[in-house]
Design a protein with these regions (language model features):
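Catalytic alpha/beta core domains of metabolic enzymes, predominantly
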Residues: 123-124, 135-175
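Active-site beta->alpha loop and helix N-cap motifs at the rims of alpha/beta catalytic domains
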Residues: 1-141, 147
């Protein structure tokens, strides 16, 4: 609940700048924001390796005020990798795992495949899952009917919908 903006991942040259990340978060802690999203699209998650992601997770939790929510992007092409990263996010104190749809084999990503992937991640994630619908990046759009089915899962607690499609969002809310 509230406003939780995405946070960029700062670099110095080609290396992570964790001190800049922590400094940015400490400044944001002084605002009325409810929390932050790290390792999402804006955080360049797809370009980072697992070791870099873990460093970011630890730095973000260290710098985020205890009264702020921390959402960490954990979506991966592999279900097992998404589960592993969701567990790592929980270990580092994330409040939610933000799970984008796998897209590499988008021709195979029908409603059944997406349901299986997202349900398995939610089943095994120790923290609540937020679906991330970002068709501009994945070329896959979570349809309202599928979102409604997934919303029945006790560990799926919301959606970040980046479609910009108000009619679709209205359908999701209605369902």
């Amino acid at each position: 609940k509230g406003v939780l903006p995405p946070v960029v991942t700062p670099f110095r040259g080609e290396e992570l700048d964790l001190e800049a990340l922590k400094s940015n978060l400490r400044v944001l802690n002084q605002t009325g924001l409810s929390g932050y999203v790290v390792l999402g699209s804006t955080g360049e998650s797809v370009y980072l390796d697992d070791g870099e992601k873990e460093l970011i997770l630890a730095a973000a939790r260290e710098a985020t005020a205890s009264d702020k929510q921390l959402i960490m992007g954990t979506g991966q092409e592999s279900t097992r990798a998404a589960i592993r990263l969701s567990r790592l996010a929980a270990k580092h104190g994330a409040n939610f795992a933000l799970v984008v749809t796998p897209a590499y084999f988008k021709g195979q990503m029908n409603a059944e495949a997406l349901m299986t992937h997202l349900t398995r991640v939610a089943d095994d994630s120790p923290i609540p899952v937020l679906l991330y619908n970002a068709p501009q990046f994945t070329a896959l759009n979570l349809q309202p009917e599928l979102v409604a089915q997934l919303a029945q899962h006790p560990n799926i607690q919301g959606i970040k919908d980046s479609t910009g499609d108000i009619a679709q969002l209205t359908d999701i809310i209605r369902l």
